[in-house]
């Protein structure tokens, strides 16, 4: 059999292909079947692939946009609902401290300090801040820090230019003077305050469903003996608002250090309770709680603070301490009153390190 060759040498477009026979080409063996012609599979056109990829990317982008819009709608509706929830409260403005310049106060853009005050007394002229706890929201170290100030601390009341117990500042000039006095004596910038009457405090705890705290046998016996309430001892004892208030106000059992410690335990329990509460339920509770509170925060500021770190703050660790510590003061009688005379330099350094630089180990404080 002769091979056939087709010549492609055309002299013009009208020429036909010239076919040649090759007499020297070897013949295939007779016992081998003729081989099928080999064809390379056709490759799909590249433009179609690109078109499909673009189509998939477009669908993914549309899904992303739809999800983003849904999130915006949810956040916006939550923002409006939260704004409405915190609108019915007692607003009281907080002016700049006129007794000390802001440059003399320690502050940080990553820390928000809110002074919580438990006010004791039915008459405004006789009210004293029986409990003062500075809540420091530390975004840099992802912590919520609670600092109790002992009410018997002997401090300068700047508006009176005289020394007195710390808890007297509120009776002299309300929340404004209480904040000014703390800043003046301790050098820490306080951004906001929230005050609640102790009678209201028990209602707040009830609206949150009570708290679980450790109650020692000594504390339980004292409450059972001196009040009309019955409380058991244990590592996790459930207290309603009335019992929690009695627990916070134990005074004659031990020291003021322990009294403030019990108050911080209840505040910590409230925060932990909030962590386990669904957001929608928490907002509904806030609607009931805020009318019981007096604060300088506007509804917009409260809502902004909640959305600035509200979700992440539920994961923050909680640390607590008090000032002064035992080695930062001398306790004794002063002008017929039991007072704590402070080493202010030591206290200021301690507060700075605890609140701002996170250098203090408070496990044993």
Model-derived regions, located:
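Non-catalytic, solvent-exposed segments at the cell envelope interface
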Residues: 2-365
């Amino acid at each position: 059999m002769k091979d056939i060759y087709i010549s492609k040498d055309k002299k013009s477009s009208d020429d036909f292909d010239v076919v040649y026979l090759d007499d020297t080409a070897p013949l295939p063996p007779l016992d081998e079947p003729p081989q099928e012609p080999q064809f390379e599979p056709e490759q799909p056109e590249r433009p179609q692939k690109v078109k499909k990829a673009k189509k998939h990317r477009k669908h993914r982008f549309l899904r992303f946009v739809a999800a983003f819009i849904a999130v915006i709608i949810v956040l916006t509706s939550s923002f409006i609902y939260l704004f409405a929830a915190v609108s019915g409260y007692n607003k009281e403005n907080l002016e700049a401290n006129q007794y000390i310049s802001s440059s003399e106060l320690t502050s940080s853009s990553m820390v928000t300090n809110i002074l919580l005050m438990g006010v004791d007394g039915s008459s405004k002229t006789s009210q004293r801040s029986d409990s003062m706890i500075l809540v420091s929201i530390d975004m840099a170290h992802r912590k919520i820090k609670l600092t109790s100030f002992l009410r018997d601390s002997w401090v300068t009341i700047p508006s009176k230019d005289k020394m007195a117990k710390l808890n007297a500042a509120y009776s002299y000039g309300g929340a404004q003077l209480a904040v000014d006095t703390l800043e003046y004596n301790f050098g820490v910038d306080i951004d906001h305050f929230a005050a609640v009457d102790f009678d209201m405090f028990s209602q707040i705890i009830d609206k949150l469903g009570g708290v679980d705290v450790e109650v020692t046998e000594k504390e339980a016996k004292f409450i059972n003996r001196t009040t009309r309430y019955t409380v058991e001892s244990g590592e996790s004892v459930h207290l309603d608002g009335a019992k929690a208030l009695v627990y916070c106000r134990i005074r004659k059992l031990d020291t003021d250090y322990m009294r403030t410690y019990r108050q911080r335990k209840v505040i910590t329990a409230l925060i932990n309770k909030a962590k386990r509460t669904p957001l929608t339920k928490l907002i509904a509770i806030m609607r009931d709680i805020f009318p019981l509170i007096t604060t300088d925060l506007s509804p917009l500021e409260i809502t902004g603070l909640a959305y600035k770190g509200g979700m992440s703050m539920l994961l923050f660790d909680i640390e607590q301490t008090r000032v002064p510590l035992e080695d930062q003061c001398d306790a004794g009688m002063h002008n017929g009153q039991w007072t704590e005379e402070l080493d202010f330099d030591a206290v200021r350094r301690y507060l700075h390190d605890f609140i701002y630089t996170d250098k203090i180990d408070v496990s044993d404080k």
